[in-house]
Every structure is written in structure tokens, then in C-alpha cells.
Curated annotation (Swiss-Prot):
Pfam families: Methyltransf_5. It is found in: Cytoplasm. This is Ribosomal RNA small subunit methyltransferase H. The gene is rsmH. It comes from Bacillus pumilus (strain SAFR-032). It catalyses: cytidine(1402) in 16S rRNA + S-adenosyl-L-methionine = N(4)-methylcytidine(1402) in 16S rRNA + S-adenosyl-L-homocysteine + H(+). InterPro entries: RsmH, SAM-dep_MeTrfase_MraW_recog, SAM-dependent_MTases_sf. NCBIfam families: 16S rRNA (cytosine(1402)-N(4))-methyltransferase RsmH (TIGR00006). Keywords: Cytoplasm, Methyltransferase, rRNA processing, S-adenosyl-L-methionine, Transferase. Its main location: cytoplasm. Belongs to the methyltransferase superfamily. RsmH family. GO terms for molecular function: rRNA (cytosine-N4-)-methyltransferase activity. Its EC number is 2.1.1.199.
Length: 310
């Protein structure tokens, strides 16, 4: 069963200023929590388009959202093709977009998907099960230098070199097949005192491999720009991030597009095309309330940023 606790539900959807006859895109359908609440505010003239590359998520969403009076369109695709897929449906502009960048709980909790360091399972981590690159391939075939780079860049792991060295030693003897084997190797690469602090010792490396396997940061950057381009004037975008790398991309994109470029002093009017594209609705990110954290610990690292197209 696809159970998924939605994070910052009302804040995310209410932040879009929903119009009942508007067109909205949920780029990360997942458990369909945000979509379900959004649909409750749409009339039969409204439209929701839900993107997901996970078959289980799409099947669950179809079931959960059946019977809504609004129009619903499900698209099985990575959101990096957001504009292209919408254009194929004859949609060239929208009134609101949601990104919820957390790995959905069912993906984390299904051991055979290989996302979790809590279960022993085959190394996989592909959001799209038909993709060629898996965690097993990264761990067993990528050169030492590339492993160090992704552990440091995507996992902000201090012991990147030591861990990559241990992986290199282990895979010379036999291929690393499971998450459990990888966890043990990671622990060997981290000094004992450091293993006792800062959460699970494999957390950062698993995050790094997942980001690399799914090309998450580049995909998000591309999709975010496409989403902003698709927005109608006064249309809004809500983005929930779960780690500093994604939040940095969102923050800098929003800041860049909501501020004026450096202009010569004393210009009487701002030249056309140079006006900011966005207005920030949230100066600082919205975080989960104490009340939400009581029943959903995964919301602890969530940050929500909202912007409006000018």
C-alpha cells in the first residue's frame, strides 16, 4: 500500500492562491496529498496535472483522486520534461506549480527499492525503474575520484576519501550487491568517534548516491526554470526542499529572478525585459510547526519557498 505522510500540506497549497478554474501542476505526485487538497478547491473548470515517474505512485494517485469534479491528467515522466510533456497536451501556461522534493515514504520503506540504509536490499535507488544507472553500478563501476566527488558534493561527507577507498578495496574482492554490505563498508571508512554523532553514518553517502543515480540537482534546476516560464502572470510556485543543496538552488533562482540586474545609475525607466520575473511570497522559508512534527518526523528538514510570477 502506498502510504505517504504529506509535508506542509496547507501551507504549500494555500500558498498558491488557488483559483477554482485554474490549471495546476503537481510535479511530484507521490502520495497525492497535496493534489487531493488542491483538487478540493477546483471546480469542474479547473485542471490538475500530476507528474510522477513511479508506477506505484501513479496507480495510488488514480485511485485516491478518482471522483473529483475537476479535470485530472496523469503523466508518467520525470519532471525535467515538464514543458515538453505539457506542450504535448496543448498546455502552454499554468496558474500554479508544486515541487515536493522528498523521496516519498513508500519508496524509502519498500526495502527492494534499495533507498534505505535501515533495510538490507539490492543496491538500486532508481526513482524510474526503467533507468539504466543504478546505485549498484555507481558503487561498483565508478572510479575512486568520482565517488569522492559525489560523496563530498552531494552528501557533504567529510570522510569522502576514506569511504571511497574502502569501497574500492571491497569491490576488488567481490561486487558490492546490497545496501547492508555498503553500510558496513561506509562504517569502516568513518572514524569511530565520528560514527557516534550526526545521525546514521551512511546517511550522507546514501543521499549522494541517490542524487547521482537520479541526476536530481540538475533535473530540479532545469525543471524549476521551466516551471517559472510556464506560469501565468500572478501564477505561483511552491517548492519544498529537504536538504541544503536543493534549497540553495531554489533560493538563488528565486532571488535572481526577483531582483533587478545591475543597471547604470539614474536610468529614468527600467528597460523592458529587465524587470524582475518573480515576486517573493516568502522571504524566509516556511518550516513545519511543532504540531506537524509530533506526527511526522520526516517534516523536520522540510523548507517551503513560494514565489509569484509578475
Amino acid at each position: 500500500m502506498f502510504q505517504h505522510e504529506t509535508v506542509l500540506l496547507k501551507e504549500t497549497v494555500d500558498g498558491l492562491n488557488v483559483k477554482e478554474d485554474g490549471t495546476y501542476v503537481d510535479c511530484t505526485l507521490g502520495g497525492a496529498g497535496h493534489s487531493s487538497y488542491l483538487l478540493s478547491q477546483l471546480s469542474e473548470k479547473g485542471t490538475l496535472i500530476g507528474f510522477d515517474q513511479d508506477d506505484a505512485a501513479l496507480d495510488h494517485a488514480r485511485e485516491k483522486l478518482a471522483g473529483s469534479k475537476a479535470n485530472i491528467l496523469f503523466i508518467k515522466s520525470n519532471f525535467r520534461y515538464l514543458k515538453e510533456r505539457l506542450n504535448e497536451q496543448g498546455i502552454t501556461s499554468v496558474d500554479g506549480v508544486i515541487f515536493d522534493l522528498g523521496v516519498s515514504s513508500p519508496q524509502l520503506d519498500t526495502p527492494e527499492r534499495g533507498f534505505s540504509y535501515h533495510h538490507d536490499a539490492p543496491l538500486d535507488m532508481r526513482m524510474d525503474q526503467s533507468a539504466a544507472l543504478s546505485a549498484k553500478k555507481v558503487v561498483n563501476e565508478w572510479p575512486f575520484e568520482d565517488l569522492v566527488r559525489i560523496f563530498y558534493k552531494y552528501g557533504e561527507e567529510k570522510f569522502s576519501k576514506q569511504i571511497a577507498r574502502k569501497i574500492e578495496e571491497a569491490r576488488k574482492k567481490a561486487p558490492i550487491e546490497t545496501t547492508g554490505e555498503l553500510v558496513d563498508i561506509i562504517k569502516e571508512g568513518i572514524p569511530a568517534p565520528a560514527r557516534r554523532t550526526g545521525g546514521h553514518p551512511a546517511k550522507r553517502v546514501f543521499q549522494a548516491i541517490r542524487i547521482a543515480v537520479n541526476d536530481e540537482l540538475k533535473v530540479f534546476e532545469e525543471a524549476l526554470e521551466q516551471a517559472i516560464e510556464l506560469l501565468n502572470p500572478k501564477g505561483r510556485i511552491s517548492v519544498i526542499t529537504f536538504h541544503s543543496l536543493e534549497d540553495r538552488i531554489c533560493k538563488s533562482t528565486f532571488r535572481e529572478m526577483s531582483s533587478l540586474p545591475e543597471l547604470p545609475h539614474g536610468l529614468p525607466v527600467i528597460p523592458e525585459g529587465l524587470e524582475p520575473k518573480l515576486k517573493l511570497i516568502t522571504r524566509k522559508p516556511i518550516v513545519a510547526s511543532e504540531q506537524e512534527l509530533e506526527h511526522n518526523n520526516r517534516a523536520r528538514s522540510a523548507k517551503l519557498r513560494i514565489a509569484e510570477k509578475k
